[in-house]
Amino acid sequence: MKTIKISYTNKSITNNGNFQGWGTSLCWWVNRIGYSPVLTKKAAELFYSEKGLNLNIMRYNIGGGDNPKHKHIKRTDSMVPGWLYFNKETNEYQYDYSADINQLNVLKACYDATKHPYVEVFSNSPPYFMTKSG
């Protein structure tokens, strides 16, 4: 996967009318299938290859995670782990990019399956320890 630099000089809030394609959010459903190379490959082919829907936009969800002490989230697909965690040994916040390996597996497969990939990144919430509800 190539790194794309974000331009801070273009202050436009639109893409100036350029159509970039079709896509889907990778939130939740890929968390459920990304453990399996077979399911990951099949999903990438069905959604992003020319043999399937030929989508090209992937919306990657950076999960906020949930307080490990809470047990209110029952659906395994919606438990998207966050990258940021507090390391008690170093007393610092650190990133663990492998925490969300299921979604990353599907993202890579989808990226490789399409000819003109666009990746958008979003988050539905901050890390749990940055909220009052926790």
What are these regions (language model features)?
Residues 2-134:
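N-terminal catalytic cores of secreted or lumenal carbohydrate-active enzymes
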